[in-house]
Amino acid sequence: GDYDVSRNGWVMDYNDPSNMLELFTTNNGNNDGKYANPEFDAAIDASKVADKSVHFQKLHEAEDILMKDAAAIPVAYYNDFWLQSPTLKGTWHSPYGYWYLQYGYIEE
């Protein structure tokens, strides 16, 4: 559509900044804002190496480009809060933010 600004969200699938940053590559199917910058794409491509130091350096460069272009404005990060009795056992929380109680039990 024809718009100046929109809101979008993403829950990280895995624990790496590339999970968020790759959303803004030109050909990413989830690049809803249609952001395109060859310099950004090149930094993301250069981050796909085994050397973690180079990986994070290139991702930081990509992030700097994204912020300089104001292609995204991070405004919030999801948090979960949970109060649980120490006697409740067997529950777990997924990286997607879901709480699983089906294996829960009370330990007396």
Label each region the model flagged:
Residues 1-26, 48, 66-67:
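Pocket-flanking alpha-helical
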Residues 14, 33-41, 52-59:
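Solvent-exposed, acidic/flexible segments
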Residues 48-49, 54, 60, 65-68, ...:
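Extracellular/periplasmic bilobal clamshell ligand-binding domains
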Residues 1, 19-46, 77-108:
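Short, solvent-exposed loop/beta-turn-alpha elements that line the ligand-binding surface or hinge
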Residues 6-9, 52-86:
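Bilobed periplasmic-binding protein-like "clamshell/Venus-flytrap" ligand-binding domains
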